[in-house]
Amino acid sequence: MEKTPATGSAVAPPPVEYGTDSITKLEGREAVRKRPGMYIGDTMAYGLHKLVYEVVDNAVDESLAGHCTDIEVVIHVDGSLSVQDNGRGIPVGPHPKFPGKDTLEVVLTELHAGSKFGNGAYKVSGGLHGVGVTCVNFLSEWFKVRVHRNGIVYEQAYAQGVPDTPPREVGTTDKRGTHIAFKPDATVMELVEFNFETLSQRLRELAFLNAGLHIVVRDERTNKEHDFKFDGGISSFVEYLNKSKQTLHDKPISFSTEREGVMLDIAMQWNDGYDERIYTFANNINTHEGGSHLSGFKAALTRTLNSYAEKGSLWKDLKETPTGEDAREGLSAVISVKLTNPQFEGQTKTKLGNSEVKGLVEQMVNDQLGSFLEETPMVAKKVVAKIGDACRARLAARKARETVRRKGVLDGGGLPGKLADCQIRDPNESELYIVEGDSAGGSAKQGRDRRNQAILPLRGKILNVEKLLREMLTSAEIVTLITALGNGIGAEDYDPEKARYHRIFLMTDADVDGSHIRTLLLTSSSGRCRSSCRRAISTSRSRRSYKVTRNKKDQYVKDEHALNEYLLKIASEHARVLTPGGELGGAELKALLEKVITYEERLEKQAKRRDARVVDALVQGARLSAETLTGRGCPGGGGEGRLMTPSSAACRTCWAACATSWCRTPSTTPRSWCSTPTRMEPCGRRCSTTPSCRRRSTWSCRLCAEHLRGAGQGAVQGPRGRGEITVFSVQEVLAAVRKDAQRGLGLQRYKGLGEMNPEQLWDTTMNPATRTLLQVRVEDAVESDEIFSLLMGEAVEPRREFIERNALDVQNLDI
């Protein structure tokens, strides 16, 4: 800002006129593209996948109306996505209230246009606001719709919400339904890459909620596919939630009923765990924050169970009546309501607001659950006994907390002796580092920023709370952690407003023990200690493992991949690849080497299931057959049976050891390489009919066509006249420049935190300007809970099956 010579004060900005012409109104497409967050929540992962859900919800509404049985969702390789259903199809034809506009175009370009506002076409629906598919159109780079209706196929395309042409007939059909394909607009959306697992989680929910609805989701980028169809409906959902648990009764308690226009479906089952997992839905929309239907269920559940137990004098030995938390301990339940006019709190529909629903749900649960308990006394007594045990455990835990509190450990007045607190008291600015080991904790205390960084060293492996929850408060390390966080634990003591730190960092060694400790800490934060960490941003520290010294200057890199990137940067700055066809260096050489590294990484993944040398030969275009694989067509003359690649000698050695069945069906138009001492050019298009081989061949062809011409036989020349190295393949180029880049470098690897002094810990791990963080987020609570129960729980057999099933996919194996 300029300052006047006389006073040194800032020059005032020019006045801004604020009059009637300052008031503007955004409408339709312009409003959505200008403020997308108002319609889809945000422009990151949530909003991106919200676009898909809006389209899918329309297909599900067709299913609710009884007109759709199949939905297919496909993520395409170009980043687009398509949704196909076999419903009635969007109506096509002139619209009576929009002269000159087709009904299909009205649906896709007019906000709040649809057939879900009356009680005609749809009795219930989730897409009440009428902006869903229109927003998808407006926020897409391109959008295409194909409608099969009344024996005719109609198509229309859009670019950023603007129609290219009116809907047109393109053929006849005996099918029906709507096919929508779109590609998110990167100029509006910050994230445009769809996550297969995120979509699968939501589509699985929809298949559970709509018994018999068949949903397929496929990812063409990775060839992953999930096929969902559950005839058991939400009962199957509850069984899925409890599949890694020991259940209290064999089958879920389920019932469906309706009262005053509200349809209620409930399924629930208790297990021997301690956490409640209740998922609520309104018109198939996942109401993450609950609402009136959840409130009604909780009230009715507690009242009905207490009434049944008191009537039979089943809790006469208890010192106090069990609470709602006791009744829901170990409960997995799914609550689904369907109503004509749902009222959601906000466009994102995360909480149901219909006040009348609470009373109706409460009445229906009272009646249905009460009847079930009377009719099945064996199950009822097991449930009541479980609740009684939960009440006794809660009272015992309260007594233990009070005992510990009297000793000054859990109360707010005394902090753990190990904790080196920070000076700031604002939780939003405070950071807590949970450090493995007292030695590393001491160095971290010396190297930290005392203003806002607190250090809590923990010794050894903490308790696995997934297995030993009852003993949790007897563990000194767990009590220390709870006390340091400050927001308590359990329904009675938990208060999120008392959290002392809103950012938590886990710092462990880069070895198997450190990984184990980090897993135990994450288990505690995901299980019963979840409430203590709910307000915190749980962050796992990715510590930098290498120190590179070059020209007397130190630089830290976090892992081997980053180290290779660093070496590649150095190599491309100085090294040159000399060929008769020209010289490669700088950015061009770096681009080539990055492609080769990617190729080698993909080849390494293939090695887990097949011989990587054969894969490499196939990808490079070798014409392999049963004869060549067994060695009968091996070396010698120029027969077609031999590998025609510069690296054929290395590949030949593996032929005899490879199973001929790996490439059972050789292509009739095999790909081969015509090689000369200086040039390689592809002379075919296909390599093998094996799908994985075709995918890799496509990539390899692109690599060779763009970068490998002229990079066959040649020489790698190092800087400052270090000499030349003759090479015969791009892999040899990569090895040569890597070796040259490492000359004169000092390389030190840090495996343990204790190996670093305070200054190094600050530079690599704690300095906000240079540290690298890995944030831990729970995007799929169901899958998260299942994996923790499976891998950290008491049941051994499911864990062994999981390990055997995924053994070949392991990435970090410590032997």
UniProtKB/Swiss-Prot annotation:
Its main location: cytoplasm. GO terms for biological process: DNA topological change; DNA-templated DNA replication. Gene3D superfamilies: 3.30.230.10, 3.40.50.670, Histidine kinase-like ATPase, C-terminal domain. Residues 1-21 are annotated as: Disordered. The keyword Cell membrane does not apply. Mg(2+) 2 binds at D509, D511. It is an enzyme of class 5 (isomerase). NCBIfam families: PRK05644.1 (NF004189), PRK14939.1 (NF011501). This is DNA gyrase subunit B. It comes from Myxococcus xanthus.
